[in-house]
Amino acid sequence: APLGLSLGKKCGRCSTRYCGPECQVQHWQEGGHDQLCKTIKKAGGAEQYNANKKYAEAVTVASEACAEDTKDQTCYICTQALHWKTKEGLVRGCSCRGTAGVVHVSCLVEQAKILVAEGEENNLDYEAMQPRWDRWTQCSLCEQSYHSVVRCALGWACWKTFVGRPEMDPTRQLALCLLGKGLSAGGHYEDALVVQEAELATGRRVGTSENANHMLTVKSNLAKTYQSLDRSEEALSLRQEVYSRTLKLHGKEHGRTLQAASNYVSSLIGLKRFQQAKKLLRKSIPAARRVLGE
């Protein structure tokens, strides 16, 4: 059942919310809450506790997966083989070659946290903040996106960092988005689906317009996850909506519209709806040529 947001039953000690008193009793008696309650409270609540736990697990998975590739090497940030505090191993999940790009997830996280905090302190606008946020997803050396288990660990790290902020805080919403994409990159599509559906529900609950770029991005990411789970009809429906709204919002020659059209065509072709795909391509290809050239 859905968790209560403000009126639901909650634990008097750690404030974990439940859908009702029966759910709370069951969790205490059978779910182990009696053993976890103090730990959850100390962590800062159920969401923070879960984020901390999942992050630690993801870092372990990433460092173990990268152990052979990073053997006898050191972190390019702290210059150590083992992290001085967490004792975690090294990872490399970008496009760096040779010995470049070897690093601790914790070092990447600290770097990203500092950059975002500095940007917020100086009230930087969206355009100036973007390169700082990129540190949660892209290598600063090769400037390519992290992938697989490393991207997944960074997604949990970002969510762990900002989960305590108010639900309407754009930073928290962006962190949730990066968590969903990180889970997808790690192949955890069912988990990504839960996160992205929650992200969409949160946007609607706080009154974000369905035509807002943020909501269109959320729906586009959700459609990609549906596609990964072989839920092609649902992916098609969302991509059709995203394309229609983006076209009205930005016009046919905007980069967002061209990308939305490409995603929509991909779904149509996947479902063998070739005539519809051909019709859309006849509209979008001339626009793409005008914007991007041959």
Residue ranges and their predicted role:
Residues 1-10, 18, 66-94, 141-153:
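Small Cys/His zinc-coordinating "RING-like" fingers
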Residues 3-6, 21-49:
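Cys/His-rich, Zn2+-coordinating zinc-finger modules
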Residues 5-15, 26-32, 90, 94-99, ...:
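Short linker/helix segments within small regulatory modules
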Residues 7-10, 14-15, 19, 33, ...:
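Cysteine-rich, disulfide-stabilized extracellular repeat modules
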Residues 15-36, 99-117:
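Cys/His-coordinated zinc-finger cores
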Residues 18, 32, 70-73, 102-103, ...:
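Generic structural microfeature
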Residues 35, 92-94, 229, 271:
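Secreted/extracellular small peptides and ectodomain modules produced from precursors
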Residues 43-65, 80-84, 100, 105-294:
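Intrinsic-disorder-linked linear interaction elements in eukaryotic regulatory proteins
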